[in-house]
């Protein structure tokens, strides 16, 4: 179980890093959209698509690890959310804290990307 949690933490950190890259591209796009620089917009969009593909790949890894954790804990994977896993880790405070930090960072990064993308629309 410990290795599954370590794996989940690592995957969440990887996903956070990918979202941070996506956020940077989204922020870079704003002035490019305003200046109507279509070549630069195309370049940034191509790089964004690469990062989105990476995020999809990482998300599949996270889903698999979550499924493995659900199997070990004899729980329904569809009801096992990250917040639930964090709560269940109360007896392992170090892992719980690492998971919570990764979850919060991921949640914040996703929210920032959504906000910038709304502005760019």
Regions found by a protein language model. Give the residues of each.
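Extended, charge-rich alpha-helical scaffolding segments
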Residues: 1-86, 90-91
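Short terminal interaction segments
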Residues: 80-121
């Amino acid at each position: 179980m410990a290795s599954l949690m370590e794996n989940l933490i690592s995957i969440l950190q990887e996903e956070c890093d990918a979202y941070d890259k996506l956020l940077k591209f989204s922020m870079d796009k704003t002035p490019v959209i305003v200046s109507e620089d279509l070549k630069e917009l195309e370049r940034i969009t191509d790089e964004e698509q690469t990062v989105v593909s990476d995020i999809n790949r990482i998300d599949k890894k996270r889903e698999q690890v979550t499924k493995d954790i659900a199997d070990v804990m004899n729980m329904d994977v569809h009801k096992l959310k990250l917040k639930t896993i964090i709560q269940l880790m109360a007896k392992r405070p170090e892992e719980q804290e690492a998971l919570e930090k990764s979850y919060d960072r991921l949640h914040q990064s996703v929210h920032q990307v959504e906000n910038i993308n709304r502005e760019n629309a």
